């Protein structure tokens, strides 16, 4: 009968056993295989499209662009989001499986950009619709900045606990696809009372309730969830 010979342990020989936890293994697998859903609506998406080329080669990060939200765990919102597009964006986000992440790319996505001052149809920040993990400012951001944002997201994934994230998302579900306009409370119109202005030389001495006059026929429209 042949005897079994055990080779002596050599320090040069690498260890074949790796000790880890299921949470760390899950985080490592998710950060190494992010599948983004491309949601480009403006010029910022052109900068992101350059990452697919050989110069930046974002495939080395395990990024595989998907066209279906049910196969993606990351959505990059690049460009202006309007009121009509808001329900579609929220619907795409809700169709993504858990855990899922969001990168807001560009000034128009984060704050509305140059359309935030006098546009009646622009959403002032995509975080009013869906929770955002990484904000990437710029007009537009460079491809190097996009890679840096993905790197920061990977670092965030490596430190998170899966159960805590699921509970936090269920608790903070402030987004919905039922975005409608409704008639809100009545407010003052801001019209000046010419009678008070002609009598008193000092405007600061007039109480606000007397300075403005109310009109019952005017009401405001509020964008609500």
Swiss-Prot record:
Top-level EC class: translocase
Binding residues for [4Fe-4S] cluster: 43-44, 108, 139
Cofactor: [4Fe-4S] cluster
Gene3D superfamilies linked: 3.40.50.12280
Primary residence: plastid
HAMAP family attached to this UniProt entry: NDH1_NuoB
Official protein name in the record: NAD(P)H-quinone oxidoreductase subunit K, chloroplastic
Gene name of the record: ndhK
